């Protein structure tokens, strides 16, 4: 049975860097929310052991793609825990709509969707907690997509607390460049000393992103894009960029601004949602009978 699964984007509604550990990892406080917009991943299970990504992503080798790595990770894990049913493969297509290096979590979301989808198709029966624990080896943001609810994250991003931010409309804009998270986090000028605060205090304060001033300084196109969007709405960087987003009270007001955007701007309008579209989709598909 073939299904097309959503692979939603995320926003960092705020992002504060509170320190750096001896091992180089950054400690942070951030608020994640999903968007009702993202990539789409179509999966057809195979009865052999082959994983085939039939729509390669430009610039990413097949075996290094997080989609393929997630599928093989689940294969390997199920091999150890479900002898006799793990020898299944998949043909995978992706309709890639999210920009790479945009701060929208596209690669992590793809990995999480594959873990959840193949857990369903292969009937491996793992819990979301198990899948999230597997996913963290693929990327720090994978667990938030697996668990499927807006969350406040602490530590290096691994400590998650369910959150219920307001579900606003957003205009998300991309400047047409890719920004490496590693490049931003290793920059000596990155702000790393924001005081740790309780969530209640953070929710009452203006939402900010500690990476924003540095990224605006290093990338002229981000500076240009954010300056334009700030003329219309409260706006900021998501993650380490390159995407920025503006907050709107309605879809119509967001689309009105998008319709008058300069030609060089790439953007879309989406609503922030606290329940992941991936989990909403999963709850609506039929339960497979054991084979």
Swiss-Prot record:
Q: Which residues constitute the signal peptide according to the record?
A: none
User: What is the catalytic activity of this protein?
Assistant: 4-CDP-2-C-methyl-D-erythritol + ATP = 4-CDP-2-C-methyl-D-erythritol 2-phosphate + ADP + H(+)
| Pathway(s) annotated for this protein in UniProt | Isoprenoid biosynthesis; isopentenyl diphosphate biosynthesis via DXP pathway; isopentenyl diphosphate from 1-deoxy-D-xylulose 5-phosphate: step 3/6
- Disulfide bond as a keyword of this entry, yes or no, is no
UniProt GO molecular function: 4-(cytidine 5'-diphospho)-2-C-methyl-D-erythritol kinase activity; ATP binding
Top-rank taxon of the source lineage equals Bacteria
UniProt-listed Enzyme Commission number(s): 2.7.1.148
Any Pfam family hit = GHMP_kinases_N
Query: Could you say which residues bind ATP here?
Result: 99-109
GO annotation (BP), single? terpenoid biosynthetic process
Quaternary structure note: Homodimer.
Q: What does this protein do?
A: Catalyzes the phosphorylation of the position 2 hydroxy group of 4-diphosphocytidyl-2C-methyl-D-erythritol.
Indicate the family of this protein: Belongs to the GHMP kinase family. IspE subfamily.
Q: What is this protein called?
A: 4-diphosphocytidyl-2-C-methyl-D-erythritol kinase
The source organism is Photorhabdus laumondii subsp. laumondii (strain DSM 15139 / CIP 105565 / TT01)
């Amino acid at each position: 049975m073939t299904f097309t699964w959503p692979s939603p984007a995320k926003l960092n509604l705020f992002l504060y860097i509170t320190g750096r550990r001896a091992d180089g990892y950054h400690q942070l406080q951030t608020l994640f929310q999903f968007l009702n917009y993202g990539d789409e991943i179509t999966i057809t299970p195979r009865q052999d052991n082959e994983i085939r990504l039939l729509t390669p992503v430009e610039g990413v080798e097949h075996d290094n793609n997080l989609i393929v790595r997630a599928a093989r990770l689940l294969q390997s894990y199920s091999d150890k825990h479900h002898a006799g049913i793990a020898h299944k493969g998949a043909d995978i297509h992706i309709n890639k709509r999210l920009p790479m290096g945009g701060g929208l979590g596209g690669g992590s979301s793809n990995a999480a969707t594959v873990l959840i989808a193949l857990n369903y198709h292969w009937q491996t029966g793992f819990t979301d907690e198990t899948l999230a624990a597997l996913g963290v080896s693929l990327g720090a943001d994978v667990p938030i997509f697996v668990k499927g609810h807006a969350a406040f994250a602490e530590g290096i991003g691994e400590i998650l607390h369910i959150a219920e931010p307001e579900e606003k409309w957003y205009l998300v804009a991309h400047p047409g460049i890719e920004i490496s998270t590693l490049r931003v986090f290793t920059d000596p000028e990155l702000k790393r000393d924001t005081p740790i605060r309780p969530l209640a205090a953070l929710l009452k304060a203006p939402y900010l992103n500690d990476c924003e001033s540095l990224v605006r300084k290093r990338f002229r196109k981000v500076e240009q894009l954010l300056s334009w969007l700030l003329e219309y709405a409260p706006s900021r960087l998501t993650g380490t960029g390159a995407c920025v987003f503006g907050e709107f009270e309605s879809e119509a007001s967001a689309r009105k601004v998008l319709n008058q955007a300069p030609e060089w701007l790439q953007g879309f309008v989406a609503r922030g949602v606290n329940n992941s579209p991936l989990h909403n989709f999963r709850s609506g598909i039929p339960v497979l009978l054991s084979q």
